[in-house]
Curated annotation (Swiss-Prot):
GO molecular function: methenyltetrahydrofolate cyclohydrolase activity; methylenetetrahydrofolate dehydrogenase (NADP+) activity
Catalytic activity: (6R)-5,10-methylene-5,6,7,8-tetrahydrofolate + NADP(+) = (6R)-5,10-methenyltetrahydrofolate + NADPH; (6R)-5,10-methenyltetrahydrofolate + H2O = (6R)-10-formyltetrahydrofolate + H(+)
Family statement drawn from the similarity comment of this UniProt entry: Belongs to the tetrahydrofolate dehydrogenase/cyclohydrolase family.
Described function: Catalyzes the oxidation of 5,10-methylenetetrahydrofolate to 5,10-methenyltetrahydrofolate and then the hydrolysis of 5,10-methenyltetrahydrofolate to 10-formyltetrahydrofolate.
GO cellular component: cytosol
Gene: folD
UniProt-recorded name of the protein: Bifunctional protein FolD
Binding site for NADP(+): 164-166, 189
Source organism of this protein record: Streptococcus suis (strain 98HAH33)
């Protein structure tokens, strides 16, 4: 069994990104700029935002975190986003989710300039993605594809099961696997006989948001298991959707939590911010 080390791969890719950024600054005078807007004081969101800021600075980017109270009105938040849309120094805009109940997530995602939507969640970018002309790709699935590439995991002709159907992970993950010529099935919380279905898959990507949901009864010997889940157990420990100790006994490759998919998500956000900066100069 091989552990897919997303943290180490992220460090490797971000070192290469820092070199590209330095060359971009030297040759064209461009510095990628990433702004992250954090609404409220959700502890998990604060951790994610700190990690994004740290990665942006390490890559040589201009970075800013805008913290606003969770009492901010929807219109004021939309106005704030528009200010960064109009500022050419910023090439990537992220609004950390989740948002307070009085703010429409849909309106916020629509407000971000598609050219600066490095999360790839604006309908314009989604449309380009689904039509086979991607510009911004949702970062978690993009990071998983980089893992497959780094570890030389063959996808063509393989049977892949994606457990989870979100617009952020499940659906785009299935599309990227299809594009790589895998045969893909999407399952979810209402899928019947899920363990039986999962045992037929060569590759299982789990993004269902339930701690330790997938046990070794779901996984055939030698399968590749990618765990996107980030949950807390009763003691506050970070755990994935996969029961790692069990499943690692039968999987050929597996991602840990933490240190698997999470660091790669942030790495791909940085890559897409760099690419947005390059496109802005054309």
């Amino acid at each position: 069994m091989t552990v897919i080390d997303g943290k180490a791969l992220g460090v490797k890719l971000q070192a290469a990104l820092a070199e590209k950024t330095a060359r971009l600054k030297e040759e064209k005078g461009l510095v990628p700029g990433l702004v992250v807007i954090l609404v409220g004081e959700n502890p998990a969101s604060q951790v994610y935002v700190r990690n994004k800021e740290r990665s942006a600075l390490a890559a040589g980017f201009k970075s800013e975190v805008v913290r606003v109270p969770d009492t901010i009105s929807e219109s004021d938040l939309l106005d704030l986003i528009e200010r960064y849309n109009q500022d050419d120094e910023w090439h990537g805009i992220l609004v950390q989710l989740p948002l307070p109940a009085h703010i429409s997530e849909e309106k916020v995602l629509l407000a971000i300039d598609p050219d600066k939507d490095v999360d790839g969640l604006h309908p314009t970018n989604m449309g380009k993605f689904w039509s086979g002309h991607p510009v911004m790709i949702p970062s978690t699935p993009a990071g998983i594809m980089e893992m497959f590439k780094e570890y030389q995991i063959e996808l063509e002709g393989k049977s892949a099961l994606v457990i989870g159907r979100s617009n952020i992970v499940g659906k785009p993950m299935a599309q990227l696997l299809l594009d790589a010529d895998a045969t893909v099935t999407i399952a979810h919380s209402r899928t019947k006989n899920l363990p039986d279905l999962a045992r037929q898959a060569d590759i299982v990507v789990v993004a269902i948001g339930r701690g330790h949901f997938v046990t070794k009864e779901f996984v055939k010997l030698g399968a590749v298991v990618i765990d996107v889940g980030m949950n807390r157990d009763e003691n506050g420990k970070l755990i994935g959707d996969v029961k790692y100790d069990e499943v690692s006994e039968v999987a050929s490759y597996i991602t840990p939590v933490p240190g698997g998919v999470g660091p790669m998500t942030i790495t791909m956000l940085m890559e897409q911010t760099y690419e947005a900066c390059v496109r802005s100069a054309k």
